[in-house]
Amino acid sequence: MERTLRKKRTGRVVSDKMDKTVVVAVETKVRHPLYGKTINKTTKFKVHDEKNEAKINDRVLIMETRPLSKDKRWRLVEIVEKAK
């Protein structure tokens, strides 16, 4: 599988307490099937951060990868925006 076919997501770092791992919350907008209201749905991913460079509230780009542990299937590509 080529790297260009892998899923990419953008989200915010909500936890950086683990070594070489950050938790990234990705928010998507979903319409309710019956009522039609737009709802914000948040999914949390454990992301591999080799250099421990992402900090809390950073906006990051993540990419799907091979399973690195029981829960980690994503890796950090770049930090889009640093936290203030």
From Swiss-Prot:
Pfam families registered for this protein in UniProt: Ribosomal_S17
GO cellular component, one term: cytosolic small ribosomal subunit
Top-rank taxon: Bacteria
Keywords assigned by UniProt, alphabetized: Ribonucleoprotein, Ribosomal protein, RNA-binding, rRNA-binding
InterPro entries linked to this entry: NA-bd_OB-fold (IPR012340), Ribosomal_uS17 (IPR000266), Ribosomal_uS17_bact/chlr (IPR019984)
Any single GO BP term: translation
CDD domains: Ribosomal_uS17
Gene Ontology molecular function: rRNA binding; structural constituent of ribosome
Presence of the UniProt keyword rRNA-binding in the record: yes
Biological role stated in the UniProt entry: One of the primary rRNA binding proteins, it binds specifically to the 5'-end of 16S ribosomal RNA.
Subunit structure: Part of the 30S ribosomal subunit.
Family classification: Belongs to the universal ribosomal protein uS17 family.
Protein name (database record): Small ribosomal subunit protein uS17
Organism of derivation: Clostridium botulinum (strain Alaska E43 / Type E3)
Lineage: Bacteria, Bacillati, Bacillota, Clostridia, Eubacteriales
Gene for this chain: rpsQ
